[in-house]
Design a protein with these regions (language model features):
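Metal-dependent amide/peptide-bond hydrolase catalytic core
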Residues: 1-94, 98-105
Length: 105
């Protein structure tokens, strides 16, 4: 018998939020050939609380395609993240806010 600490959950893939992320990521790295692949992580996240409330929740890294993914070590020993990835992920998050809130502003 499996003793779950939380109910398994997921968010739909084709959403307004994901479209805003795609647009913003493309702009932040100045490329329109980025391929998007949904995946499942074995990590633990607070999304178990937000999804229960009906909030679409994604894990998103925003890694820059020119940074070496083999050097990225998030949440591990000698944790590091490429500078280009830090800049592009920050631009992407700001872009997502703009895309989603633009009609309101």
């Amino acid at each position: 018998e499996i003793d779950y600490m939380a109910k398994p959950n997921s968010s739909p893939f084709e959403t307004e939020l994901l479209e805003a992320i795609k647009i913003s990521q493309s702009r932040s790295v100045q490329r329109d050939d980025i391929q998007w692949i949904p995946s499942v992580s074995n990590g633990f996240t607070d999304s178990r609380f937000t999804r229960e409330l009906g909030v679409i929740t994604y894990g998103f890294r925003g890694t820059h395609p020119d940074d070496n993914p083999n050097l990225e070590n998030v949440h591990g020993t000698n944790e590091n993240y490429g500078v280009k990835s830090l800049v592009s992920s920050t631009k992407t998050m700001l872009g997502v806010i703009w895309e989603l809130c633009n009609p309101v502003i």
